[in-house]
């Protein structure tokens, strides 16, 4: 299976990348920069900036699945959670839909929709709502694990 993993070199993304590679998947590891994970480089690295849709053009072509761990994990003076967690993931979703990707998995947080006063959580909840409204996708959910939840969306 060909998988695009966005946010592949963050903490969670790196763990997912290692597992996908170990399981023998064809992986496109996309992030702003590549880092050494101490594994064989049995993946293709693509430099992206989810806030710049032009860097995403064609990134999902031929992929069966997109997994995104993209999101701010700490404060930033240059970007907001709405630009990354919401709009950036929406840019990626639009590219996945254009490429006819069958599955889209967004790694969010438990009860993001219950904390609208926290920008990072609110931005994630807003993107979850976009996924639910995506006209060419259907929703199925995976149970949460620890503090993360995976929302899986499959095309009809």
What are these regions (language model features)?
Residues 3-25:
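N-terminal Rossmann NAD(P)H-binding glycine-rich loop of SDR-like oxidoreductase domains
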Residues 2, 64-65, 103:
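Structural motif
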Residues 26-28, 33, 79-142:
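Conserved Rossmann-fold NAD(P)-dependent oxidoreductase catalytic core, especially the SDR/UDP-sugar
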Residues 14-16, 39, 77-78, 115-117, ...:
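Short glycine-/acidic-enriched loop or helix-start segments at secondary-structure transitions
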Residues 35-91, 95-99, 111-113:
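NAD(P)H-binding glycine-rich loop region in Rossmannoid oxidoreductase-like domains
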Residues 118, 141-156:
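Flexible, glycine-rich beta-alpha linker
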Residues 4, 28, 46:
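Conserved Rossmann-like nucleotide-binding pocket used by diverse enzymes
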Residues 21-28, 32-42:
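A compact, surface-exposed functional segment
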